[in-house]
Swiss-Prot record:
Organism: Shewanella sediminis (strain HAW-EB3)
NCBIfam families for the chain: guaA_Cterm, guaA_Nterm, PRK00074.1
Gene coding for it: guaA
GO cellular component: cytosol
Single GO molecular function: ATP binding
Chain positions recorded as ATP binding sites: 235-241
Residues at the active site: 85, 181, 183
Record has ATP-binding as a keyword: yes
Source taxonomy: Bacteria, Pseudomonadati, Pseudomonadota, Gammaproteobacteria, Alteromonadales
UniProt keyword terms in alphabetical order: ATP-binding, Glutamine amidotransferase, GMP biosynthesis, Ligase, Nucleotide-binding, Purine biosynthesis
Functional description taken from the UniProt entry: Catalyzes the synthesis of GMP from XMP.
Protein name per UniProt: GMP synthase [glutamine-hydrolyzing]
EC numbers for this chain: 6.3.5.2
InterPro entries (UniProt xref): Class_I_gatase-like (IPR029062), GATASE (IPR017926), GMP_synth_C (IPR001674), GMP_synth_GATase (IPR004739), GMP_synthase (IPR022955), GMPS_ATP_PPase_dom (IPR025777), NAD/GMP_synthase (IPR022310), Rossmann-like_a/b/a_fold (IPR014729)
Length: 525
């Protein structure tokens, strides 16, 4: 079995919104990488022993006092270094070059760089040829400051009309700097540049692949758990489902899954989870029907944040009760993924703001005295999905749109009642069914229905009715940080509306949400 961690890249984060994207691109190339805060110690870098280091972008200005700098050891470690945007600027400043503050001369968005000197980073890459016969590349810029003088030993590899040093290189030391962002899709050949860096310049082997990751995870789980038993909260979501499949492969019947039906799931979801994991895959599952307990706990509560906390608290209570019944369980498995780890590590800066509290199993009681098993903690979401496919989970389940941890608890506005949840389940199922039929489901990033606790007059036959309102929501996004409302065809929306009003007794009006993010969030609560 190949060692999937033998060749690796270290990415130092200076605060750019694109930093995780760099890590995902390196992983897609087939090379393992980790993302650390910029102020790591020499000992930590030596301990990690990377084959190459990437200095990512950031919002600060290199010209400002006390702005972040790469550890000096980065440039003495004897490995290739790639500086991206802010990373190029701090590399330049730290190695003797000069960076000046941009005053109205920044570049934001599309730009075209002209390659002036050959470099391993840009080998055999071009989007067009200039009139002077030099390669041109379409790139994505996002910088105000710029490098005025490059350090000794470097050459200017590329420039734009307003940026004299859009890329620089010291081929002897294998140090490279690019002022643009190769990790974003707008830089058309960006992935090839990162491939050149990781595979050719750093000489990493591309052995970070789903089959290898599964083999490695199963082997490590067997070593960690031995003959002990494990308990897992299975929600039917992507992360917990993949954890369940990995553990089942590693330890078989020594895994007990606890599936809590909180009454806030999608239509028939509880049955689907039990059929798939219990009947089809043969996992040992305890099914807890706790609908009344959750609804009773939320009675009279309309505040979204309070509802989230109640749902999380009741789940923890139930899980604690069930875990005590598994007297031989020594380990608790969780679906923690790499962005969760990065978020936790990065929170020490104090710069992150809580927009919504996250529903996680992290609040389990300390007295559970169980060891923690987190087989996905090195993986991004797209990697988790690929592994799920390899483990035999169905595509439709793995690539379903995101569903919030509190479920319909935050899609019923205000107080949550069984009547509201039942109506919402039916309406949402019609919307999703029609999206699939029209082959629109995978063309939007997320689609769902929201229950509004307001009544509206409607006409059915010769009579009037005074029933509830639902809102359809569909968005298109790349990263869920920003989103556009999806321009679904009017005839499609009309069909969905007619079906919901005619087929569901209790709903008299359907509206469509045309709010972008920002200013609105994707979920209503």
């Amino acid at each position: 079995m190949s060692n999937i961690h033998e060749h690796k890249i270290l990415i130092l984060d200076f605060g750019s919104q694109y930093t995780q994207l760099i890590a995902r691109r390196i992983r897609e190339i087939g090379v393992y990488c980790e993302l650390w805060a910029w102020d790591v110690s020499e000992a930590q870098i030596k301990g990690f022993a990377p084959n190459g280091i990437i200095l990512a972008g950031g919002p600060e200005s290199v010209t400002a006092d006390e702005s972040p700098r790469a550890p000096e050891y980065v440039f003495n470690a004897g490995v290739p270094v790639l500086g991206i945007c802010y990373g190029m600027q701090t590399m330049s400043e730290q190695l003797g070059g000069k960076v000046i503050e941009g005053i109205g001369e920044g570049e934001f968005g599309y730009a075209q760089i002209e390659i002036q000197e050959p470099s391993e980073l840009f080998k055999s890459i071009e989007d067009a040829i200039s009139e002077s016969g030099k390669p041109l590349l379409d790139v994505w810029m996002s910088h105000g400051d710029k490098v005025l003088d490059i350090p000794e030993g470097f050459v200017t590899v590329a420039n734009t009309e307003t940026c004299p040093h859009a890329a620089m290189a010291n081929e002897d030391k294998k140090f490279y700097g690019v002022q643009f962002h190769p990790e974003v899709t707008h830089t058309r050949q960006g992935k090839r540049m990162l491939e050149h860096f990781a595979l050719d310049i750093c000489e990493c082997e591309a052995n970070w692949k789903p089959t290898s990751i599964i083999e490695d995870a199963v082997e490590r789980l067997k070593k960690q758990i031995g003959d002990d038993e494990v308990i897992l909260g299975l929600s039917g979501g992507v992360d917990s489902s993949v954890v369940a499949m990995l553990l089942h492969r590693a330890i078989g019947d020594k895994l007990t899954c606890v599936f809590v039906d909180n009454g806030l799931l999608r239509l028939n979801e509880a049955d689907q989870v039990m059929d798939m994991f219990g009947d089809h895959f043969g996992l040992n599952i305890v099914h807890v029907n706790a609908e009344n307990r959750f609804l009773d706990a939320m009675k009279g509560e309309a505040d979204p944040e309070a509802k989230r906390k109640i749902i999380g608290h009741v789940f923890v209570e139930i899980f604690d009760e069930e875990s005590k019944k598994c007297k031989n369980a020594k380990w608790l498995a969780q679906g923690t993924i790499y962005p969760d780890v990065i978020e936790s590590a990065g929170s020490a800066t104090g710069k992150a703001h809580v927009i919504k509290s996250h529903h996680n199993v992290g609040g389990l009681p300390d007295d559970m005295e169980l060891g923690l098993v987190e087989p996905l903690r090195e993986l991004f979401k797209d990697e988790v999905r690929k592994i799920g496919l390899e483990l035999g989970l169905p595509y439709d389940m793995l690539y379903r749109h995101p569903f919030p941890g509190p479920g319909l608890g935050v899609r019923v506005l205000g107080e949550v009642k069984k009547e509201y949840c039942d109506l919402l389940r039916l309406a949402d199922a019609i919307f999703i069914e029609e999206l699939h039929k029209a082959e629109l489901y995978h063309k939007v990033s997320q689609a769902f229905t929201v229950f509004l606790p307001v009544r509206s007059v409607g006409v059915m036959g010769d009579g009037r009715k005074y029933d509830w309102v639902v809102s359809l929501r569909a968005v298109e996004t790349i990263d869920f940080m920003t989103a556009h409302w999806a321009h679904l065809p009017y005839d499609f929306l009309g069909r969905v509306s007619n079906r919901i009003i005619n087929e569901i007794d209790g709903i008299s009006r359907v509206v469509y949400d045309i709010s972008g993010k920002p200013p609105a969030t994707i979920e209503w609560e």
